[in-house]
């Protein structure tokens, strides 16, 4: 699976690692992704999401129902 947050859309990005002598070598910066289950009261079930820590904090702030409609739109 891709290392992408399902709420914020954060994904790995490339950059430079710098040594003490300021030599640049390419490297990847990966987001802090966690698998987390949330209880969705309207559906009466758990939903498992892969989120960055920022995404978990946003769900704690606004609630899972707010993001649930964006992640799983009605068909």
From Swiss-Prot:
Pfam families: Ribosomal_L28. Residues 1-21 are annotated as: Disordered. The keyword Glycoprotein does not apply. GO terms for molecular function: structural constituent of ribosome. SUPFAM superfamilies: L28p-like. Keywords: Ribonucleoprotein, Ribosomal protein. GO terms for cellular component: ribonucleoprotein complex; ribosome. GO terms for biological process: translation. Belongs to the bacterial ribosomal protein bL28 family. HAMAP family: Ribosomal_bL28 (MF_00373). This is Large ribosomal subunit protein bL28. The gene is rpmB.
């Amino acid at each position: 699976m891709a290392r992408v947050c399902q709420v914020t859309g954060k994904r790995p990005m490339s950059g430079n690692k710098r040594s003490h002598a300021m030599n640049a070598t390419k490297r990847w910066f990966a987001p802090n992704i966690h698998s987390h289950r949330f209880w969705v009261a309207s559906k009466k079930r758990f939903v498992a999401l892969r989120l960055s820590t920022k995404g978990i904090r946003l769900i704690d702030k606004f609630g899972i129902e707010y993001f649930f409609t964006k992640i799983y739109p009605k068909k």
